[in-house]
Structures are given as structure tokens and as C-alpha cells.
Amino acid sequence: QIRTKLSKLGGTDWSRAKTKARAAAKDLAKGLIALYAERQRRPGFAFSPDSPWQKEFEEAFDYEETDDQLRAIAEIKADMERSTPMDRLLCGDVGYGKTEVALRAVMKCVLDGKQAAILVPTTVLAQQHYATALNRFRSFPVRIEVLSRFKTPAQKKQILQDAAAGKIDLLIGTHSLLQKSLHFKDLGLLIIDEEQRFGATHK
């Protein structure tokens, strides 16, 4: 049970709290503005046009794509092939096929020798994406790992080492992906699932 601390009537506690909150919001806004300005200033990596392996991966999809899926995939690929860092929001109802759209972007990233990461809000969702990705990439030499509380300390340490060495192509995880001890050798794509469940500072 959360107990909210109330300010006394006629006191200065509430006024100080508001001043502190405003200052924190301004600092965060300044940081975000600086970050977006830096993104626009610094060129990103322009991914290569689709390769035969990309086509083979997409043809292995068990279902027929919807028009919305195909449009989203085409737009994301076009973004990835530009030198400006991609910042795209993909919205869709449950069952829309967003995961397949994301995995095709992952494949495009990995084929250019880059690493990809999928950040999710819950351990259950991390395991679901891990199982889906393992099945989807089963015929391709793509190493996939999941970082969550189900891993032992030794397993977590090994995953961190392998990510830094570039031995992991796709890493899926919860907030553990945000830890300062995690370093990628060459991260080319970050996908945030259910991004509304992460704060602006995290993102």
C-alpha cells in the first residue's frame, strides 16, 4: 500500500515540491531537445538494399502479409536505408503482425553485420518474443539470446560478454537491457515493444 505524504495547509512544502518538479521537468526537456538535435546532426548507418537472404527470410513467413504490414515493412526499410537515424512508431491492434514487421527489420540489420535489440516491459513478453524469434530464424545463422531474471548470474555474465564481443546478433530483454554494464560491439537497431510502458528517460 502506497502512503502519500500530504503537505500542511499554509505551509511551504507544497510550493517547494512544485518548484522542484518544474525544475526536474525543464532539465528533462532540455536533455531530450539536445538528444534529438544530436540525432539530426550526427549521420547514422545507411543499411544496404535487400539481399537474397532477406528475400528468402521473408518468403519463409507462414502467412500472407496484410496490406498494412507490407506498407509498414516498406516504410521501415526505406528509413533504414537512409543515413538519418530512424525513429519510427509502429501502431497496430493485437494480431496485426507487428512482431513479423520487427523481425524483418532485425534481419535487415543483422545481414549488414550489425546487432539488434528488442526491449520489452515484462519477462513473459521477453520469453514470448524469444520463442518466436528462435522459430522464425531457425533456418538462418542468427544467434539470439534473452536477458531476464530467469537467467543465472553466470548466464547473465556470459551474455554481457558475448554482446560486447559481437557474438550475439539479437538480444531480447526487459529493463536489464538498460543496465550500464551492457555494451554492444555494434548495435544497429533498437526496437521497443509497448513503448508507452517505458519512461522518457529510459527511452
Regions found by a protein language model. Name each.
Residues Q1-L70:
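Upstream accessory/linker segments immediately N-terminal to the RecA-like ATPase cores of bacterial MutS
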Residues D62-M86, E100-V101:
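N-terminal pre-P-loop "Q-motif" helix
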Residues E81-G92, E100, G113-Q115, I168:
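Pre-Walker A (Motif I) flank of P-loop NTPase domains
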Residues D87, V101-Y130, R138-R143:
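Conserved SF1/SF2 helicase motif Ia
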Residues A102, H129-Y130, Q179-K185, E195-K203:
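Conserved ATPase-coupling elements of RecA-like P-loop NTPase cores
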Residues L125-A164:
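Conserved helix-turn-beta segment of the N-terminal RecA-like "Helicase ATP-binding" lobe
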Residues F150-L171, L178-L187:
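Conserved motor-coupling elements within RecA-like helicase/translocase cores
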Residues T174, D193-E194:
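Walker B catalytic acidic pair
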